[in-house]
């Protein structure tokens, strides 16, 4: 078996990536989320494949086909809710994975980090298009509002929006193409994940100390396969509790009403995992400014390697920047709450202040804190 594992041209790639991979001996449970994201992707692709067998991407039957899946297909309700809540688990793992990368300075592995940002954009695009497919009220109006943002692009904006819609409004053509893209993107994401891993294995994993761990490596299997398996069990337990006991807790009741272009919902809002970005978008009165802020809210992550001023890699031994980091986490929670609130006083001003704080902490305060810590520790 050892001979096959190390000699076979295909199996040896798997061996070098998941079995004999030298890993730091001290990586904590925060390093579990990469494998959990892989699991989430597999769950989403499998459940999505079975949903696609019964779904019809036509405006007149889309809503009914989702109802049919839940009522008439064997375990259709389970597949549908695993897919919907699986997306939420996917984003929870994504945010924790990115947060861990920010905390421990993993963004200094620039190729891996930038590939991760591309993956984040791809997953967000996939989730957005998936939310449109059930063709409920929030699906339709969410698609209308978000695609309409592209009309803010000077000169070509309106033409671009109509091109994406395939007409003069969100209609049958839009739904059909969103289904096509929603189906193909996860496979593109899977390919990008392998590129992400390729870049990661060029440098090796970071660790909680931020120090070079070449002198103290252990094989990935059995140590981290067992550790990842515990994470998998916890994730699956959390997902199944959500699916079997609270399947609709993260959804919007408006999406149980079929799409009606003549009736606008009182509060148009995306799924919970987009609310922080939606709050940043709404906090700027100018349409183009809001769109730019929305894109920059994610793209600002690409600036982190350039904004790294500290002589230390992670935040493990940096209390001032740690404080800034946790204020940023609290700020993101505030933005998520504001994104789900109506556009009125006092939510408008809270959203604007939280949006300013978000960019200020990342671009100004954290780099400044790094320089202060260098001076305190005489690391200059």
UniProtKB/Swiss-Prot annotation:
Effect seen on changing residue 378 to G: In strain: Isolate AF 3221
Domain of life according to the entry: Eukaryota
Effect of residue 286 to S: In strain: Isolate AF 4995
Outcome reported for the amino acid change (mutating residue 349 to V): In strain: Isolate AF 3221
Gene3D superfamilies the record matches: Cytochrome Bc1 Complex, Chain C (1.20.810.10)
Bilayer-spanning residue ranges: 33-53, 77-98, 113-133, 178-198, 226-246, 288-308, 320-340, 347-367
GO biological process: mitochondrial electron transport, ubiquinol to cytochrome c
Location, primary (coarse class): mitochondrion
Keywords: Electron transport, Heme, Iron, Membrane, Metal-binding, Mitochondrion, Mitochondrion inner membrane, Respiratory chain, Transmembrane, Transmembrane helix, Transport, Ubiquinone
Binding residues annotated for a ubiquinone, in chain numbering: 201
Obligatory cofactor(s): heme b
Binding locations of heme b b566: 97, 196
Pfam families noted in UniProt: Cytochrom_B_C (PF00032), Cytochrome_B (PF00033)
Location of this chain's protein in the cell: Mitochondrion inner membrane
Topology versus the membrane: Multi-pass membrane protein
PROSITE patterns: CYTB_CTER (PS51003), CYTB_NTER (PS51002)
Binding-site residues for heme b b562, renumbered to this chain: 83, 182
Keyword Transport assigned: yes
Variant or mutagenesis effect after changing residue 375 to S: In strain: Isolate AF 3221
UniProt similarity note: Belongs to the cytochrome b family.
Function description: Component of the ubiquinol-cytochrome c reductase complex (complex III or cytochrome b-c1 complex) that is part of the mitochondrial respiratory chain. The b-c1 complex mediates electron transfer from ubiquinol to cytochrome c. Contributes to the generation of a proton gradient across the mitochondrial membrane that is then used for ATP synthesis.
Complex formation: The cytochrome bc1 complex contains 11 subunits: 3 respiratory subunits (MT-CYB, CYC1 and UQCRFS1), 2 core proteins (UQCRC1 and UQCRC2) and 6 low-molecular weight proteins (UQCRH/QCR6, UQCRB/QCR7, UQCRQ/QCR8, UQCR10/QCR9, UQCR11/QCR10 and a cleavage product of UQCRFS1). This cytochrome bc1 complex then forms a dimer.
Note: Heme 1 (or BL or b562) is low-potential and absorbs at about 562 nm, and heme 2 (or BH or b566) is high-potential and absorbs at about 566 nm.
Protein name as annotated: Cytochrome b
Source lineage: Eukaryota, Metazoa, Chordata, Craniata, Vertebrata
